[in-house]
Amino acid sequence: MRRLLEYGGYAAAVVLVAFGIGALVLSVNGKSTVKDDLSQEKIVGSPDMTPDAIAAEAQKAGLSGVDLPSCSVAGEQVDTGSEARCFAEYMHIHALEATGGKTYAEMPRFATEDGKGTNDPAQAQKDANGQPVSNAAREIWVTETALATALNTAYMADQLGNFGIVVGIALILAGIGFAVLAWTALRGSSVRAD
C-alpha cells in the first residue's frame, strides 16, 4: 500500500509539473504574440497622450465629469498590453472631444440642415435618393469602439498571460512539493517500520 501511495505522489508531482510547464510555455507564447501583433500595427502615441496635455485639451473642449487617463504613451510605440489599454483610454477622450462630449447613444441618428441632428427620419436631411442622411459624427464612435475593443483585448490577453505564468509557477512548485512529500513522508515511514 505504501508503494502505491508513493508512486501516486510521484505521478501527481509529474502531472502538476507538466501542467505548470505547459501553462508557462503557453502564457509566454501568448504574451509574445500580443507584443508582436501590436508592434506590427506601428501604433505610436500622439504628443497629447500625457495626463497634463489631455487634461488641457479636455478642458478646452469643455469636457467635464470625464475620467482622464493617468498613464502616458506620448511618442512611444504601443507594443504591450498596458500601453494598448492606455492608448485606448486616450482614444476615448479624443472621440468625446470630436463629438462635443457626447457618446454614440447620446447623438442623434440622422443629420439635419441646422447641424443639430434628429432621430426622426422625416425631419432628417435627405440624400440624392430621398433617404435620410446618417449622422456622420456617430461614425467616430463606431471606429473608436472597434479600435478600443481590439486594444483592450490585447490588454486582456497580456494580463491572462501574466496570470498563466503565475499559475504555471504555482503548479510547478506544487508538483515539487508533492514529490518531496511522497519521498520524505513515505520513505520515512518505511524506514521507521523496518
Residue ranges and their predicted role:
Residues 1-8, 157-194:
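Juxtamembrane interface at the cytosolic side of transmembrane helices
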Residues 37, 56-58, 157:
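Intrinsically disordered, low-complexity regions enriched in Pro/Ser/Thr
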Residues 19-29, 179-182:
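C-terminal TM-helix exit segments that contain a strictly Trp-centered aromatic cap at the helix terminus
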Residues 7-23:
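Hydrophobic membrane-insertion alpha-helices, especially the h-region
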Residues 3-4, 40, 55:
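Beta-strand-rich luminal/extracellular ectodomains of secretory-pathway glycoproteins
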Residues 126-171:
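Short, aromatic-rich amphipathic segments at membrane interfaces
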Residues 45-144:
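Long, solvent-exposed extracytoplasmic domains/loops
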Residues 27-46:
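Alpha-helical transmembrane signal-anchor/signal-peptide segments
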